[in-house]
A protein has these predicted regions:
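Conserved N-terminal subdomain of the carbohydrate kinase-like
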Residues: 1-75, 254-259
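Conserved beta-alpha-beta core of the PfkB/ribokinase-like small-molecule kinase fold
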Residues: 76-154, 160-161, 170-171
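Glycine-rich phosphate/pyrophosphate-binding beta-alpha loops
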Residues: 29, 75-79, 234, 240-243
């Protein structure tokens, strides 16, 4: 029921769902979000196991993966087999085809067998990645660094060409090979931060597509514009409750940026 609802939601937004795999033997993982007074969240999950952990290598659509412009994945598909192997195989397919690889590692303790295993698995794929978004806390968890600035440097050394460390209401640290800078967030009244990081990264990836050049050849001002657009998307997202319902339209984002 929940999976079909989500599929219909995507279709209503004009998103192609042809490659979604349905597994009648497992239910869709459910996330329950508790919202604090400042809009920050606590998560709990129903996943014993969820259908998302059951994706198999043979179910991958190689034509679709090889033909896309950006292949984005997160770390929660690395928690269990067979999805872990399928995810890594999909990333390798995309990379072999010259597709830009985007990665967003999330640490949700209840979905991992241990913190040590989570860190090991989340780090294992970084070398395959071109652009990466990570929170300040998770950047330190991944690297063991003393600060998120140092963590960004260490992540860049692992392979990514561009790293974005999200800093909540402070904005984001954008880091590339020869430069890093904090791009301040738009000041808004946050009621629910669910989806803020995803919205931010969606804005960044949209900008990268519109610039249409290899990330390593982008000028710093172009990288900065990517972050500003991402911050604008996130700034609107946190003003509404919910995940998908709070994601703004492109028109709303540009209007917000002009104010």
């Amino acid at each position: 029921m929940h999976g079909k609802f989500l599929k219909k939601t995507l279709q209503k937004e004009g998103i192609n769902t042809d490659a979604i795999v349905e597994d009648p033997g497992y239910f869709t993982t459910l996330a329950f979000v508790e919202i604090g007074e400042n809009g920050e969240r606590n998560f709990s999950f129903a996943r014993k196991p969820g259908a998302d952990t059951q994706l198999k290598k043979e179910e991958l659509d190689q034509t679709l993966i090889s033909g896309c412009r950006i292949f984005h994945f997160g770390s929660l598909s690395l928690t269990d087999e067979p999805a872990e192997s399928a995810t890594i195989e999909a990333v390798k397919m995309a990379k072999a085809a010259g597709v830009l690889i985007s990665y967003d590692p999330n640490y949700r303790p209840s979905l991992w067998k241990s913190k040590e295993r989570a860190v090991k698995k989340m780090k294992s794929v970084v070398e395959l990645v071109d652009v990466m978004k990570v929170s300040d806390e998770e950047s330190i968890l991944l690297t063991g660094a003393k600060s998120y600035e140092q963590a960004a440097e260490e992540i860049l050394a692992m392979g990514p060409k561009l790293v974005a460390v999200t800093l909540g209401e402070q904005g984001v640290l954008m880091a590339a090979k020869n430069r890093k800078e904090i791009i301040k967030a738009f000041q808004t009244n946050a009621v629910d931060t669910t989806g803020a990081g995803d919205s931010f990264w969606g804005g960044v990836l949209c900008s990268i597509l519109s610039i249409n050049k290899p990330v390593e050849k982008m000028e710093w001002e172009e990288i900065r514009k990517c972050a500003v657009l991402g911050n604008a998307v996130a700034g609107l997202c946190v003003q509404k409750r919910g995940g998908i319902p709070a994601i703004p339209t492109k028109e709303a984002v540009f209007e917000f940026m002009q104010k």
